[in-house]
Structure formats: structure tokens, C-alpha cells
A protein has these predicted regions:
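Phosphate-binding and adjacent anionic-ligand microenvironments
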Residues: 125-127, 164-340
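Gly/Ser/Thr-rich loops at beta-strand to alpha-helix junctions
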Residues: 2, 75-80, 135-136, 178-180, ...
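A generic beta-sheet turn/junction motif
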Residues: 76, 133, 304-308
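Predominant activation on well-ordered alpha-helical scaffold segments within soluble catalytic domains
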Residues: 28, 55-58, 81-84, 88, ...
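Gly/Ser/Thr-enriched, mixed-charge loops and adjacent short helices
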Residues: 5-124
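Short hydrophobic/aromatic-enriched beta-strand-loop microsegments
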Residues: 91-98, 147-152, 190-198
């Protein structure tokens, strides 16, 4: 989901899962000491993986597509070729934007983390879907032009899996970032919610531990474990559309009927030096004292980004005014602390 200068590689284990923290740390601590041979090697280009992946996704289109008018933002990323072919062969009414990667424009003013680009392209009644650059996450825009994050999509797919007897143990895994309204909806549906730290790898680990069918993050990383052990934006899109078709509803109507989200504000502070563990603890103390002073009827979350030099500060409360006031006060206190 980052600009091209952050492009890199992901290491996947033999089960198709992301590496555990201790293995990542071991690799990072040793990689600079490994001397690579100063020689060229050969490579082979193959379309076999594309064919297998296409067939895997295509066989899931077993539902009525006629009610969907879809606009897709592929973030000039890895989904650009396959999403067009999938929608074309299945006779969707669709349009695709940000679908011309040049090696530098990945996620540039587009994709799941720049959703305004998609919203501005939508006409009334159209459904929007935005991937990020590596297409492991999906954010949707409902027919009224309102953003639907991972919380909404997790609930939608969980209800579909439950209605078709595919929701193992009635368990849904989410992270501490999920909205309190989402958690209320999970409880109302008699699902058991397992909460993890932020990061799809922690979601995946909890899903294995609790034998869960679905889990994910508010950011749009969603894992449907009976199909894949990791998040996949295209798979999430197919299951979201499958669920809407099954329930014979629209995304805007599903949201209105099933989830009342609390106001949230997420601020990303760009920093040259990231706070260490002790500083984060001190910031949490500052936030706790402020919450007591302001009698905050809500919550806050302060954490370092795992991918960028940013401090992420989330505030959630029952009304917009409380969120805005507390967030502004907290951000000012954080800035003052970090400058001292």
C-alpha cells in the first residue's frame, strides 16, 4: 500500500503463510553479514502461476452478477491484469481505473489507502472496490459513495458463511483497530470475537489457533482460511459480491441494517525518529490522563507503523465532537512530548 520507493519482497513459508516474528528477526540480524556472489544469474518467466490463480478465482463466480455495476481501482499494482480478465469473462458491468502500472505509479493517488480517487469516479448507484498495490487488501465504496472498510466486509462475509454453514466454531478474528460498533454487531449475531494485535500475520495465527473461517483487519486485509491462508483482495471481493447476491441486498442497505459504527479518527504522524517502547508507554500514560480529564466515553490507540516512519493515533468515541476534540488535544500533547 506504500509508494514505489518502499517496494520490496515478502518471504512466505512452505504453508503459504507470512513468517513468524522470531524468524523475521533472525533473517534481519544476519542478512547484512551474508556475502552474495558477485555474478549474474538467469531467470525464467512463466504464466503458469497466473493461469492457476485465474482458474482458482474464476470457479468461485457461481452467483448472479446482473445486479452489480462495479468500478475497480487496481492501484496500478499486481491485480491490474487478472481483475480485468476475471470481470470480463464473467460478463460484469464494470470499469477499471488506475490500471496502467509503469513501475513507479503503484499506489500513487489511488488504491485502498487513497480511496478519494475511486469515490470521485463513481456515479450514483455504482459499487466501488479498491485494492492496494500487492492486492492483499480490499476497501469498498457503497452505492451511496460511502467508504466501507474491512470491519463491514468481515461482518458481511461472516454472516454469509454462517448462513451457509461454513463459519467454523462461529469464530470471527479481528484486531484492536476494529470499531466498537463492529464488535457489537459480532456479538448480536452470536459470533465469538477473537481480538489480536494489529497485523494480518497475528490474525492468521489466531485463526489457526481457534480454527476460524474468517478474520481480518479494518484496513482491508481479510483472510478466508478455507480458501487461502493469507489475505487476498480479489478473493475478498468475490466473497463480498457473493454475500450481497445471497442476501439479495446492496452494500449500503447491508451496512444500514447490520452495523452502527462509532465515529473514529486516525491520525498518522510522520516522524524522523520513531518512539521506542518506553516512549510509547509514556505516551499511553499521557493519553490515559487526558481521557480521565476529558471523561472520554470511548478509547484511543497509539502505535508505531509497521511499514512506514509514522506514529498512528486512533481515537474512537460515541459522537464526532468528542472524537475531534480529544484527538486534537492528544495529538498536540504527543507532539510536545516528542519535541522535548
Amino acid at each position: 500500500h506504500n509508494p514505489s520507493e518502499y517496494n520490496g519482497i515478502k518471504l512466505i513459508d512452505e504453508n503459504g503463510s507470512k513468517l513468524q516474528d522470531e524468524i523475521e528477526l533472525a533473517i534481519e540480524s544476519n542478512i547484512e553479514n551474508i556475502s552474495l556472489p558477485n555474478t549474474h544469474t538467469s531467470f525464467k518467466e512463466s504464466q503458469e502461476g497466473f493461469k492457476v490463480y485465474f482458474e482458482f478465482l474464476n470457479q468461485l463466480f457461481d452467483f448472479d452478477l446482473t445486479s452489480f455495476d462495479l468500478v475497480v481501482d487496481s492501484a496500478n499494482g499486481s491485480a491490474y491484469k487478472i481483475i480485468e480478465k476475471l470481470l470480463d469473462v464473467n460478463d460484469f458491468e464494470f470499469n477499471i481505473i488506475a490500471n496502467n502500472p509503469d513501475g513507479k505509479n503503484i499506489n500513487l493517488d489511488s488504491g485502498a489507502t487513497n480511496i478519494d480517487n475511486l469515490i470521485n469516479k463513481l456515479k450514483n448507484g455504482q459499487l466501488g472496490a479498491a485494492f492496494d498495490g500487492d492486492a492483499d487488501r480490499l476497501i469498498m465504496v457503497d452505492e451511496s459513495g460511502t467508504t466501507c472498510n474491512g470491519d463491514v466486509l468481515i461482518l458481511l462475509i461472516a454472516k454469509y458463511l454462517s448462513s451457509t454453514n461454513q463459519l467454523k466454531n462461529d469464530v470471527v478474528v479481528s484486531t484492536v483497530m476494529s470499531n466498537f460498533g463492529f464488535k457489537n454487531s459480532i456479538e448480536k449475531n452470536n459470533f465469538k470475537n477473537i481480538e489480536t494485535a494489529v497485523g494480518d500475520k497475528y490474525v492468521a495465527e489466531a485463526m489457526v489457533e481457534h480454527n476460524a473461517s474468517i478474520g481480518g483487519e479494518q484496513s482491508g486485509h481479510i483472510i478466508i482460511s478455507d480458501k487461502l491462508p493469507v489475505g487476498d483482495g480479489l478473493l475478498t471481493l468475490i466473497y463480498s459480491l457473493k454475500a450481497l447476491s445471497f442476501f439479495k441486498t446492496t452494500l449500503v442497505q447491508f451496512r444500514e441494517d447490520n452495523i452502527e459504527e462509532y465515529p473514529q479518527k486516525l491520525v498518522n504522524l510522520e516522524l524522523n525518529d520513531m518512539p521506542n517502547i518506553q516512549q510509547i508507554k509514556e505516551l499511553e500514560t499521557i493519553a490515559k490522563l487526558l481521557a480521565e480529564e476529558k471523561e472520554l466515553d470511548g478509547r484511543y490507540l497509539i502505535r508505531n507503523s509497521g511499514t512506514e516512519p509514522m506514529l498512528r493515533v486512533l481515537v474512537e468515541a460515541r459522537d464526532e465532537d468528542s472524537v475531534a476534540e480529544f484527538s486534537n488535544n492528544l495529538i498536540n500533547k504527543i507532539k510536545n512530548f516528542l519535541q522535548t
